[in-house]
Swiss-Prot record:
Biological processes annotated in GO: defense response to virus; modulation by host of viral RNA genome replication
Name of this protein: ToMV susceptible protein tm-1(GCR26)
NCBIfam families listed in its UniProt record: PRK02399.1-2
Function: Inhibitor of viral RNA replication which confers resistance to some tobamoviruses including tobacco mild green mosaic virus (TMGMV) and pepper mild mottle virus (PMMoV), but not to tomato mosaic virus (ToMV strains L, ToMV0 and ToMV1-2) and tobacco mosaic virus (TMV). Prevents tobamoviruses RNA replication by affecting the association of tobamoviruses replication proteins (large and small subunits) with host membrane-associated proteins (e.g. TOM1, TOM2A and ARL8), thus inhibiting the replication complex formation on the membranes and avoiding viral negative-strand RNA synthesis.
Species lineage: Eukaryota, Viridiplantae, Streptophyta, Embryophyta, Tracheophyta
Top-level taxon of origin: Eukaryota
Gene name of this polypeptide: tm-1
Length: 754
């Protein structure tokens, strides 16, 4: 897939090439032309990739001179059980559903691992359905456009709460004609403008707003309360986003919470819960409040408008409710008063959610009414029902330091109650409304700017290893700075003719004295623990323990005793129970400055290795892990066992390629089968040559097999070019321990007693 090799900002033009190839190509050409035109005055150069999402058996393998992703590559992202789907079912609806899920995964991966700058597609009703939910899964702010035949009338099912833009196609998307040319050209130009505009504005405004943003829910019957709350929050320095509690409003607010646009919530009007429980037309769903609680942001909750359920015109109210107390808000909206029994159900729903919270929550309850209609002389005034609601919540909620329940002798629309809401919120939120808060969609661009600042600090670092800004969209400046300093030191050593020496460590004492000996790099991985327990290194590839958990345990032992030398983590990239992006962040936070791919499937061969590759547990996962780590600014030093693997790792951005010659042969538990020392020279050279064809600046080290002593390392280094040193694991700690302890004990045993 061509896009995998490019880390520059990139847009995807997506459609079904089997039925709309000409239209997709025309759109892609105009997107590229507009991007090039707009980019003349921009520092960003944006690439275009065409993505085929066809579900027929007709294969398309290219589209003019564009980078192209065939449908089979998108389909490979669809996981079902333990395998993948190799072909689509004959039923069109099922095929579209599968491709939709595959595309969603494909875009999610692209957004996480590349600089995805935007997506644009075209289609009829089926194509729009296929594209829209996948597009909606991307963060708000990333341009997302569909030219569609159904871009009119009821479009909520396509757009949801996202910022997806639908362009009416006017005519059917069936060939290029005078009308479709105009529509596709304009849509392509508008999309290109969104992309460049976002990239440029993000350079200047990467922090979305200096103000802490608060989401507030409102209904017409709680407007006085919300207006007073909003006015007070603005005076306190906060920005407010008000959402009409219509079902869609609550979902929109929680989507913005997930995206990082909202940092606190005053959920004053929770009436959507009533519609959900009873069956109204403005209902939330079962996930209401989940995003707020998962993000652990300040939440103040009240019971606004929980005295009513919403329906359309009076004639649409279900027959079983026709005898209930109904208030006709207008010709299109009818409100039904809730009962004591229903209020108990609302309280149970809310309490069940909030009792699971692991962050601070405050529930504020007004005793004298929950809406403008719940007041003396108004249609829904019912002190018994209101009292039941508030008392039920007090009884069900776990009132403790984490969850506070406060009851006030006010009506919800009294200014005193509004002030009490804000006071409770201020107790939980930052003292100042001014904070640095990034949205999900702006983080990658902010990362590039931070990287730029670091790289400007090191102007002498002008090789490929240092200067490609777009390689580091997810890098923290401090992480990237460590990487650059380490690589610069290594480059300085190489320029002075000194070898780079890396070492594996399985214990704190090994690492401590490797550093004392002057080693340049230390790598921790599970086989080090097994080696120092008297077992062979291959134990680290067998199901004896959790390899990644062992590395985290070893960090506590090793990192405190190593003072200056870079310490890297050996990562089992094929681990099916860890999300690699999250695990790498965990390693970074612990204190590791880089990673290596170990345990590695490279040590397997034959049918077993082939089966691993065929079942999605192959070396490619290790390449992906290294690429992800590289984008985070971590130092990457992967093992490669052949030239092809070296090429893949170099293209992934690896800083140091370690040419692995197999299990070390020396010592009491070393291997007996390996290449000869002479053969290893040829193998190491081939790996070095392949690496340098991709990245001439990459560092190459030799390792393993017959290379188990300083003499053997010197033999290889003197007979190769472009190989800069040696990395030892068994040879650095197991063999010295075997030899030193054996010799020391023998010396003691040789003491004469005469």
């Amino acid at each position: 897939m061509a896009t995998a090799q490019s880390n520059s900002p990139r847009v995807f033009c997506i459609g079904t090439a089997d039925t709309k190839f000409d239209e997709l190509r025309f759109l892609s050409e105009h997107v590229r032309s507009s991007l090039n035109s707009f980019s003349n005055k921009s520092s960003f150069k944006v690439g275009v990739t065409v993505v085929d999402v066809s579900t027929s058996r007709k294969e398309t393998n290219s589209c003019a001179d564009f980078d192209f992703v065939p449908s089979k590559d998108v389909l490979s992202c669809y996981a079902r059980g333990e395998g993948t789907v190799g072909r689509f079912p004959d039923i069109r609806g099922q095929a579209i559903a599968i491709m939709n899920k595959a595309l969603e995964t494909f875009l999610s991966k692209a957004n996480g691992e590349q600089n995805l700058a935007g997506v644009i597609g075209l289609g009829g009703s089926g194509g729009t359905s296929l594209l829209s939910s996948a597009f909606r899964s991307l963060p708000i702010g990333i341009p997302k456009v569909i030219i569609s035949t159904v871009a009119s009338g009821q479009t909520e099912s396509y757009i949801g709460t996202s910022d997806l833009v639908l362009f009416p196609s006017v005519v059917d998307i069936c060939g290029i004609n005078n009308v479709s040319k105009v529509v596709l050209s304009n849509a392509g130009a508008a999309f290109a403008g969104m992309v460049i505009g976002r990239l440029e504005s993000s350079k200047e405004h990467s922090i979305t707003n200096g103000k802490f943003t608060v989401g507030v829910t409102m209904f017409g019957v709680t407007t006085p309360c919300v207006n007073a709350v909003k006015e007070r929050l603005v005076k306190e320095g906060y920005e407010t986003l008000v959402f009409h509690a219509t079902g869609v409003g609550g979902r929109a607010m929680e989507d913005l919470v997930r995206g990082g646009f909202i940092q606190g919530v005053l959920d004053i009007t929770t009436t959507e819960v009533a519609d959900y429980v009873v069956g109204g037309v403005m209902a939330c769903d079962s996930s209401r409040f989940d995003a707020i609680l998962e993000k652990k942001i300040p939440l103040v909750l009240s019971v606004g408008a929980l005295d009513m359920v919403n329906f359309g015109p009076k004639t649409t109210i279900p027959p079983e409710f026709q005898q209930r107390k109904i208030h006709q808000h207008n010709e299109q909206v009818s409100l039904m008063h809730t009962t004591v029994g229903e209020n108990k159900k609302f309280a149970a729903f809310i309490a069940e959610k909030l009792n699971k919270a692991s962050s601070s929550v405050c529930v504020c309850l007004p005793e004298k009414g929950v809406s403008a209609l719940d007041a003396p002389g108004k249609d829904f005034y019912d002190p018994e029902a209101t009292s039941c609601l508030t008392h039920e919540l007090q009884m069900l909620l776990e009132n403790n330091e984490r969850c506070q329940v406060k009851v006030y002798p006010y009506h919800i629309n009294d200014v005193e109650f509004a002030n009490a809401l804000v006071d409770s919120f201020l107790e939980m939120s930052p003292k100042s409304g001014h904070v640095e808060c990034q949205t999900a969609e702006s983080k990658s661009i902010q990362g590039i700017q931070n990287v730029n600042a670091v790289l400007e600090k090191y102007p002498s670092c002008n090789g490929k290893n240092f200067s490609r800004l777009n390689d580091f969209p997810n890098a923290k400046p401090e992480t990237l700075q460590k990487r650059i300093v380490i690589l610069q030191k290594l480059k300085d050593q190489i320029s002075k003719g000194k070898p780079i020496i890396g070492a594996g460590a399985g214990t704190g004492i090994s690492a401590k004295f490797e550093e004392a000996g002057g080693v340049d790099l230390i790598v921790l991985y599970n086989s080090g623990r097994f080696r120092m327990a008297g077992r062979g290194s291959l134990a680290g590839l067998l199901p004896f323990a959790d390899a990644n958990a062992i590395v985290l345990e070893m960090a506590n032992e090793v990192l405190p005793v190593v003072k200056e030398v870079a310490v890297l983590a050996g990562v089992c990239a094929t681990d099916p129970f860890r999300r690699m992006d999250n695990f790498l962040k965990q390693l970074e936070s612990v204190g590791f400055c880089g990673v290596q791919n170990f345990p590695t499937v490279g040590l397997f061969d034959g049918n077993f290795r082939q089966n691993l590759e065929e079942t999605g547990m192959g070396y490619g996962l290790e390449v992906e892990m290294i690429a992800t780590a590289h984008r985070m600014g971590l130092l990457t030093t992967p093992y490669a066992f052949c030239p092809d693997e070296a090429v893949a790792m170099a293209e992934a951005g690896a800083d140091i390629i370690v040419a692995h010659m197999g299990l070390t042969t020396s010592g009491s538990i070393g291997a007996k089968t390996a290449v000869s020392l002479e053969e290893s020279v040829t193998c190491v050279q081939a790996i070095a040559d392949a690496t340098h064809r991709i990245n001439p600046d990459a560092i190459v080290l030799c390792h393993g097999g017959p290379i188990s002593s300083p003499e053997e390392a010197a033999y290889v280094l003197k007979r190769t070019t472009g190989v800069h040193g040696f990395y030892g694991a068994s040879s650095m700690e197991r063999l010295p321990v075997e030899q030193a302890i054996t010799a020391t004990v023998q010396q003691y045993k040789s003491i004469s007693m005469e």
